[in-house]
Amino acid sequence: MASLSTMHLINHSPASRRRIMSAAAAAAAKLHLPECFTITKSAWMNNTENLTLNYQLNHKKISKVAGINRVATVDAPQVHDQDDSTENQGHDAVNNIEDPIEYIRTLLRTTGDGRISVSPYDTAWVALIKDLNGRDAPEFPSSLEWIVRNQLDDGSWGDDKFFCVYDRLVNTIACVVALRSWNVHDDKLKRGVTYIKENVEKLRDGNVEHMTCGFEVVFTALLQRAKCLGIEDLPYDSPLIQEIYHSRQQKLNRIPMEMMHKVPTSLLFSLEGLENLEWERLLKLQSADGSFLTSPSSTAFAFMQTKDEKCYQFIKNTVETFNGGAPHTYPVDVFGRLWAVDRLQRLGISRFFESEIAECLAHIHKFWTEKGVFSGRESEFCDIDDTSMGIRLLRMHGYDVDPNVLRNFKKDDNFSCYGGQMIESPSPIYNLYRASQLRFPGEEILEDANKFAYNFLQEKLANNQILDKWVISKHLPDEIKLGMEMPWYATLPRVEARYYLQYYAGSGDVWIGKTLYRMPEISNDTYHELAKTDFKRCQAQHQFEWIYMQEWYESCNVEEFGISRKELLLAYFLATASIFELEKTKERIAWAKSQIISKMITSFFNNHNTSSEEKLAFLTDFRNSNGLNNTNMVLATLTQFLEGFNRYTSHQLKNAWGEWLAKLQQGEGDGAADAELLTNTLNICAGHIAFREEILSHNEYTTLSNLTSKICQQLSQIQNEKKMEIEGQMTAETSIKNKELEQDMQTLVKLVLGKSSGINRNIKKTFLAVAKTYYYRAYHDAQTIDTHMFKVLFEPVV
């Protein structure tokens, strides 16, 4: 029989080892589906949503891999132990991940105030500031030079890779005004004017969701400046422009002028478009860095009106940082770090950057306030988007965060991105929804947030209203739809990563502020390439392991115990979708084998043909370590599994399995006992227990174990009832929305994510990982699980 102990290639010479791995890798390259896992060609070619996977359960063995012992291919560390020889050249790209990892590490370590693209609009406002010594020249000539250098071929200014009419027009009018103010580059000015005149009517067809922030207010304010400067040929009196003026006036009439002078509001972001401002009062709302709500254009306008020194220093620092340019908002240290961590986690590559992520989140926690956070640190104004992302990520990493901070964004039964928001957008509410799923018992604000966000997003999806006002992302509707179909409890890490590989656009995502902008810490092609390469490497390893698992299935005659290949595949998939890292072969195989072996033993004990004497003999031989020489296939399989580890690990495993067998003998073998056995097996095999066996009886460990067992028992019951309902045997009486189950899951999440009283965090995470696989099986139907298995284990990553 195949065993883990035979998986190591230590006894092979380096040359032999390379030949073995090369042949195995070549086999993996061809292996898309195992023989027992087939799919109709038409269904796959059409990429239908209702993809069905038909298992052909046969007794054929997978063909030998070029005469190589397939067991050897499961040695995880050897997968990337290859040289530059010709036979391995086809796999060099897959294994060469050090360069992108180092690039991303450097990117994260040097984030500073955040990286963001320059805004021509804001740069133009900075260029309007007159020389402080009275000369007829700009105070920041480098800003004017930036404008001159960055006009696009069509005469406009703006994002050169994505066309948004609002972005192009507001940038272009601002740059035209700046050029005329200093009477320079008349040729560029005329080309800009021509562009505005020829394209302004496109506003009628523009997506209102993609309208840049405050467009009606700031665009018309700049048109007025252009008119005062005598710029001719602009469509000042066109019907469309008059409509925009009307919209501006309506918006200005709604502004609570008294309120905006008292407390920080979003209006501080666009002061350059407002009238009748009381600057003495507004200066009291200035941010600590001298800006008005991190906006260079708003701050530049404020400086023109007040000559405030703090405003000047903010502008000067920004211009120096961006070589004459100015972004639409700065700093973006909070926003950049939060979304970078989120992207790396969802792409499944965060493990390469643990120390960098820890530093990012420590930075966020340092600037966390009772109001929440904003895109830049030390802001009195906060928003629900950054705050929700902060709650979720900080909580996931063990920080104590009070979710009641979300009450700042709640009015009646509704939540909004910030006070005074006119049109609510999907992406911030989706992040609120994601945060609300990590709730602890008694957190009513997260329960309210969950209900609101769920209903809001379902309505948006139903009405096909997923265009967002903060980000232009091709796959945002798919991402939100999947998030609604797969709640966090029922989401496994590798399934999430596989889908997010499809949805993440890298540098293709464009963000919307006063202008369009891009952020390399968030939208980065290197993230995407590394994630795809890493997924391919892991998937190849998983396919090696799956070959091995089928060999083991055959050699142990598992099918004789009523366990199908499909059940074997499901057991291995659940392990792989939860613990996917290359180096964790041992844990994956232990997970899958323990699930199958426990079923074999249960089948043996529950078989009416098994006598009491045979059961007693089984237990006696197990206790006496007399398994390998026993004719009982079940006991031999169990013994071989337990002896595939070092002596101390085998001893701990035998104790854990002995306790489970005792419960089985007493008729207590159920989902609870199985879950307890699995978590103990995983923690022991992973080395979390090591020489500290007392951990297994630690109060926190037993609390986690008992709660996880209870949850898994409930979920097993739900799953069994669902299966029987499908077969027409009964109507399911237990719902996965059971209130007690929800409370138990919340308690488990709190125990795992909260502060520990002596138990390693990795040990606690094992309990949650196991519970989530039970939840996953109870929540999703068989067809959905089949699709996930195919995508994670066999579908090539393009």
Swiss-Prot record:
Keywords: Chloroplast, Isomerase, Magnesium, Metal-binding, Plastid, Transit peptide. Pathway: Secondary metabolite biosynthesis; terpenoid biosynthesis. GO terms for biological process: gibberellin biosynthetic process; miltiradiene biosynthetic process; terpenoid biosynthetic process. Highly expressed in roots, and, at low levels, in stems and leaves. GO terms for cellular component: chloroplast. Its EC number is 5.5.1.12. Its main location: plastid. Mg(2+) binds at D383, D385. Belongs to the terpene synthase family. Tpsc subfamily. The Asp-Xaa-Asp-Asp (DXDD) motif is important for the catalytic activity, presumably through binding to Mg(2+). This is Copalyl diphosphate synthase 1, chloroplastic. The lineage of its organism: Eukaryota, Viridiplantae, Streptophyta, Embryophyta, Tracheophyta.
